[in-house]
Amino acid sequence: MAAAAASRGIGAKLGLREIRIHLCQRSPGSQGVRDFIEKRYVELKKANPDLPILIRECSDVQPKLWARYAFGQEKNVPLNNFSADQVTRALENVLKPEASTED
């Protein structure tokens, strides 16, 4: 799981500075992201207490995962119509070493 991967320090080795998740409070396209937050946010945060994990809700916004790395590099992944499991896999992908390139 992403929380376990991050707790092993993988994110730290990449220079991962912040994770942001943008979603809509009501849209069907953000349902999987809302499910992910309800089911997995606490575990993820407990495994990564020093990593800022920001949840940003905004009406009619397309759900998206942002990872900010050292030197201002960012990676983003659209999450529209993803299930909670797909959101988990997207998060795991941004924690991989090859993910730390600018998008």
Curated annotation (Swiss-Prot):
It is a peripheral membrane protein. Keywords: Acetylation, Disulfide bond, Electron transport, Membrane, Mitochondrion, Mitochondrion inner membrane, Respiratory chain, Transport. Its main location: mitochondrion. Gene3D superfamilies: Glutaredoxin. It is found in: Mitochondrion inner membrane. One of its GO terms (cellular component) is respiratory chain complex I. The modification N6-succinyllysine is found at residue 64. The keyword Transferase does not apply. It holds the Pfam family L51_S25_CI-B8. The modification N6-acetyllysine is found at residues 64, 75. Disulfide bonds join 24-58. InterPro entries: NADH_Ub_cplx-1_asu_su-2 (IPR016464), Ribosomal_mL43/mS25/NADH_DH (IPR007741), Thioredoxin-like_sf (IPR036249). The keyword Oxidoreductase does not apply. The modification N-acetylalanine is found at residue 2. SUPFAM superfamilies: Thioredoxin-like (SSF52833). Accessory subunit of the mitochondrial membrane respiratory chain NADH dehydrogenase (Complex I), that is believed not to be involved in catalysis. Complex I functions in the transfer of electrons from NADH to the respiratory chain. The immediate electron acceptor for the enzyme is believed to be ubiquinone. Complex I is composed of 45 different subunits. Belongs to the complex I NDUFA2 subunit family. This is NADH dehydrogenase [ubiquinone] 1 alpha subcomplex subunit 2.
